[in-house]
Each structure stands twice: as C-alpha cells, then as structure tokens.
Amino acid sequence: MTDTWLIVGLGNPGAQYQGNRHNVGQMVLDELAGRVGAGFKSHKARAQVVEGRLGIGGPRVVLAKPMTYMNVSGGPVSALANFYGISPDHVVAVHDEIDIPFNTVKLKIGGGEGGHNGLRDISKALATKDYLRVRVGVGRPPGRMDTADYVLRDFGTAELKELPFLLDEAADAVELLLQEGLTAAQQKFHPAKTAG
C-alpha cells in the first residue's frame, strides 16, 4: 500500500446542488485543491480528482469529488482506493453533519453513519466503517422541516457570511489530521467541555 491519502468530498453532482448544505464536503475539497495548487480533472472512477501534495513537503493526496449522487458514493470511493492502492485507513470522508452546529468541525474514525446515506454506501463499498471522517456542521433543520429538504437547500444569508471561515477551518482540520494524526486534530478542533 501507499502513503497517499484519499480525501473524498461528499455531495451531489450538478449546478443545482452546488450551494446546498449537503455539498459542503465538496466545497471543502475546492478549498483544499486551491492549497494543492491544481484543478480537478475527470477520472474513469466517476469522480473529479486532484493529485498533489498538501503544503511544501506535505502528504501526498488524491482529492476526489464523486460524480455520482451522494447515496451511491461508495463505488467511486472504492474504485479510487483500488486504483491508487490506498487502504481504508488512509481514506478521509469530508461530509455535512446535521448533529453538530453550523460552523463546527469534528473528526472521528469509524462508528455509525448517523443516517448519512453517503457514508453508509462508502462503508459498504470499503467493507469497513474504519475510515476517517471530517464532519462539517450544518446544524439541524428548524421546527418540523424535513431533514432531506433542509440539507438539499442552499445555506442561508447569515450562514453564507460565515461559510468561507467554516470551509477554511475544515480544510485546516484535514491538513492537521494528515500531518499530526487524529488525536492532535481532535484536540484542536473539539472544544474542551467546561465544568458546571
């Protein structure tokens, strides 16, 4: 296996979805591609990819945006992992997370998918849940709004003002995760709980 990392930004293809909360993972990958200094190119695994290094002397990465609908992201992720010889412990899924507040980034390895069908499909395709996740908080829907309707809507006006900072923070989390490991990244991006 290789020391290359596969960083996958989850979302739906097509212009009509680009500003949706559900596509925040792909937005983070656009930020990372800027840091790598390369543009996305089509790959036979039904994905747009960027290959390069994150930072000078940084880790080798394949940034990937599956060009399938989110619920069937596993096929492209598995195909890319096989193509590049990347094991599941070097796969990072960047995705929207309704169970944490907007403007929050959290990291974990394995565990449940929390009803996220994109993660469920990746777990099935990789035959393991033991891959890294960078969870980008989009918050819960207001009132009785359906969760699917909420994540398939664009960010609100107030959120759009904060979104560049959130994308930058999530990209920083990916970089720290790759350079210093999960524990260091969690210590930085998970606020300490205060007593009381």
UniProtKB/Swiss-Prot annotation:
Q: Name one GO biological process term.
A: protein quality control for misfolded or incompletely synthesized proteins
Reactions the enzyme catalyzes: an N-acyl-L-alpha-aminoacyl-tRNA + H2O = an N-acyl-L-amino acid + a tRNA + H(+)
Q: Does the keyword Iron-sulfur apply?
A: no
Q: What is its main location?
A: cytoplasm
**Annotated site residues (Stabilizes the basic form of H active site to accept a proton) in this chain:** 96
* PROSITE patterns documented for this protein: PEPT_TRNA_HYDROL_1, PEPT_TRNA_HYDROL_2
Cellular component GO terms held in the UniProt record:
cytoplasm
Could you name the active-site residues? 22
Compartment(s) of residence? Cytoplasm
Q: Where is this site: Discriminates between blocked and unblocked aminoacyl-tRNA?
A: 12
Describe its assembly. Answer: Monomer.
What name goes with this protein? Peptidyl-tRNA hydrolase
What species does this protein belong to?
Answer: Pseudarthrobacter chlorophenolicus (strain ATCC 700700 / DSM 12829 / CIP 107037 / JCM 12360 / KCTC 9906 / NCIMB 13794 / A6) (Arthrobacter chlorophenolicus)
Its organism's taxonomic lineage begins at:
Bacteria, Bacillati, Actinomycetota, Actinomycetes, Micrococcales
Q: Which gene encodes it?
A: pth
